[in-house]
Amino acid sequence: MDGLVLRKLGRRFGAVDAVLDFDLHIKPGEFVSLLGPSGCGKTTTLRMIAGFIDPTSGSIELDGKILSAPSGSVPPEKRGMSMIFQSYAIWPNMTVSQNVAFGLNLRKLPSDEVKKRVGAVLETVRMSHLADRYPAELSGGQQQRVALARAVVIRPAVLLLDEPLSNLDANLREEMRFEIKRMHDEFKITSVYVTHDQGEAMVTSDRIAVMNNGRLEQIDSPYALYSRPKTRFVASFIGRTNFLSGNCGNHMIDFAGFSVPLAMIGEEVSGGGPITVSIRPQAMKLSATEAPREKAINLQGSVRQSSFLGETWDYVFQSTDSGLQFRVAAPPADVFEVGAPAWLQIDPAQIVPIAD
Amino acid sequence: MTSVSHPAASTWSDDQPVKVRVPWHQRLQPANLLWLFLAGILVVLIVAPMWTLVVSSFTDAKTGGWTLHNYVEAYGKERHITALTNTLKMGAVVVVLKLAFGVPLAWACTRTDMPGRNFVRYSVFGAFIMPPYLAGVGWILLAGPNTGWINRVWHSLSGSTEPLVNIFSFGGLVLVTAIGGFFLVFVLVSSAFEMINSEMEDAANILGAGPFKTAMKVTFPLVMPAIIGAALLSFLGAIALYGVPALISIPARYPVVVIQLTEFFSFPLRIQVAAAYSIPLLLITAAMLGLQKLILRRKGYVSVSGKGGERRIVKLGRWRWVLFGYCFCVVALSVLMPMFVLLLAAFSDSWTAGFSFSNLTLSNFHYVLFEHSSSQKALVGSIGLGIVAATVAITLALFIAYIVQRKLIPFSGLLAFLAVSPYVVPGIVLAIGFYAAYALPPIALYGTYTIMALAFVTRFLPIAFTTSSAGVRSIHPEMEEAVRILGGGRVTALRHVVGPLLKRTLAGGWLLIFVPAAQELSTAIFLVGPTTRVVSVVLLDLSEEGELEKLAALGSLLLIIIVAVVAIGMRYLGRDFMLRRS
């Protein structure tokens, strides 16, 4: 199978499974993020891919060749990968161009070829004018660019990124996200990106693998992950959401105070009994007057809390009938006082049943 | 429970049989062989000599069979037992003296506004550079019973014919031993004083404690572990020292262990008995260091671990000159006076004639450089051995420290233990071990530079290891992982990244080894051959021949070369490289 394949991958430290039964197939040229809270096993997974940690179960293969297995692994230096580290790990004893040339020199390329490639990649990351500087003379963002250049210049089989932006300030981080995306689009390197920042993962990735407690929760495109979360963890970790408990039966889901026909919601549901759904704050609309819309669920109630976040309002709406509370996002022009009566419309197509 | 129908994260992996084996040639890292090689070196340097030492102490010299006779012979004579108890007594008194010298100086230089702090610091550093046996010679020139300068001044002043001071006495022995080693107390205790954050003392002040109470209740308890550690090391240094007893304890008729050991090594050669007799020295050292570990492990003694914050300087007022007076006395006794008389003697026709222009000459230097049979070669040999020992020890230690810090192999802790274990072996005992293991046929390295270089490397491996280990710990592992993921092995990472990053640390460690290695006496004494004498041994020969002026000239030359090397090092490393070590 082409690409990078993790098969039932597991790593145990003492009595703790840091990673367990992790299956993942990354196609050639794909950019996949491992996203999860700290301690979820994403960095362990990445370091297993790099070869710094051996798995205790399962295997890793690249283009059909086994790289890692509990019985032994190909060492990192023989994998033809490259990596961008959290600390950048730019060698302070070498200049920018020496840092970038290091991997090429290890590959015993002729020196004019090395020079040409280093020049070209420094051009790409806009660092040509600083080629002879030492790392101590560079800013954090510039060091990050050097790390990026050093990693891509060898045209690695797989590029691994270990929270590369976590040491940068917010503005720079935003800029570097697009930089990384741009580099990927330009070189089409199979990439695995570890982060706990969903924004980073959303911008850069073709697909995001959400991890929790050493296991894969869901892998999907950023849009699918946001609009169709499959588990409670994914729904709450990616963006904000409302969880509602209901009961499923007779082609309807019954919630406190209202019911939705199964046919109207976007997902197929089989069987019956208790069910949990996720409704994003953006899947609802608040209005001051009763203006029932076709195919929408209309609830009457009032605004209980409000906070202004700049790009949106964050309201808490409480239904009069059931007392249920909803977080609702509204554009800045939709101003409601706390305590004001309001009507809520929910788009049933955006109600997503989830597994607990 | 309702089941939401979505496909499991992926199911395709179940379809395919999993073959999990990476071919061995892909798994092979050439570096792994290096680790094996290093373990082999440590066996040669440490395990084999020490094992041979212990085994030969139980071996019958004639039959080669097992025996306890060596122990009977070693401890059967009252004289031999006296030497043991004398050694312990001397060690105890030396510790008291070294602390009395080192602790006040360390406090004065780090925590007070005493004038001349840098002068005191440099002078103490001079004590590090001057080998103890040269200080001993200096004091023989100063306080020899008949011709010592102090006594001659006393005779002419008082008309008495009795000496005022006599260096050939128990007092002389402990004084000279103490001045030759108190710099270690100074270094350890000053760095402890520098680690204390003044906020700890401020906290006591704000609660109502005065300066004296604060010092007694807060400051000194915090440096106590350093003082205890320094005291133990002082004791071990004192009982293992060879040069000073060789000069003083024989004329003083005060037999000590090291001198007794040389007796076993003179004709008739009794290595097995010497081995048996050196075992207590080894056991005492091991026990002392074990004791230190035990004391330091106790809770409450761990507070001096933080990074030093801002330190408050104690304003001494009028007392600053009193303290300076005391410090001056100590550095005068330990460095200035012996160094001065040594230089003067080196340039004198006859040191007993006192100072006059007619007495000045360069002939002593000419003699040791061009006429004497072995001193010129010895200078080259000593400096060369110093360079080789420092370089090999640092290189070896860097690799070992790397393996240990990065936990590359199972039981890497054992490598660390081996690398620091020569610490508990006094130089003279190490020499006996090397003699027993490698001097005689079939290996027959006796009298070669090789056996001395090996022994010196072993002797200084602990310093090298401690320095390298701290250095490696300060390097982020990702620095090396970046090398490896780009296709370089661990050895490449060591050569291109770890090594260059540790250049300064390693150079500092190199100097800390070079200085004592170029002067080393106790390890050399049993290993030198007729054609491979080192300066320290030639100096002792000259002292036995009574050629003190020529001895002084040769000693000065050695000092000048070492000072030059250290000066170059300090230019490159900054002057405080020695104090930064803890």
What are these regions (language model features)?
Chain A
Residues V5, H25, E61, W343-Q345:
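ABC ATPase nucleotide-binding domain
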Residues L35-P37:
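The feature captures the beta-strand-to-loop junction immediately N-terminal to the Walker
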Residues T43-L46, V146:
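ABC ATPase nucleotide-binding domain helices that frame the ATP-binding cleft
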Residues A50:
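Helix-to-loop junction immediately C-terminal to a conserved catalytic motif
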Residues S59-R79, L109-S111:
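ABC ATPase NBD Q-loop/coupling interface
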Residues P76, G80-S82, Q86-F233:
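ABC ATPase nucleotide-binding domains
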Residues M252-S307, D334-D356:
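Glycine/charge-rich catalytic "coupling/switch" loops of P-loop NTPases
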